[in-house]
Amino acid sequence: EWEEWLLA
């Protein structure tokens, strides 16, 4: 994904 670090 990409939001893994966004909403980490």
Swiss-Prot record:
Keyword Cell wall biogenesis/degradation tagged: no
Subunit structure, interactors included: Homooligomer.
Described function: May play a role in clustering and fusion of late endosomes and lysosomes.
One GO term describing the cellular component: lysosomal membrane
Alphabetical keyword list: Cytoplasm, Endosome, Lysosome, Membrane, Protein transport, Transport
Superkingdom per UniProt: Eukaryota
Species in which this protein is naturally found: Mus musculus
BP-aspect Gene Ontology terms: protein transport
The protein's name in its UniProt record: Vam6-like protein
Main subcellular location: cytoplasm
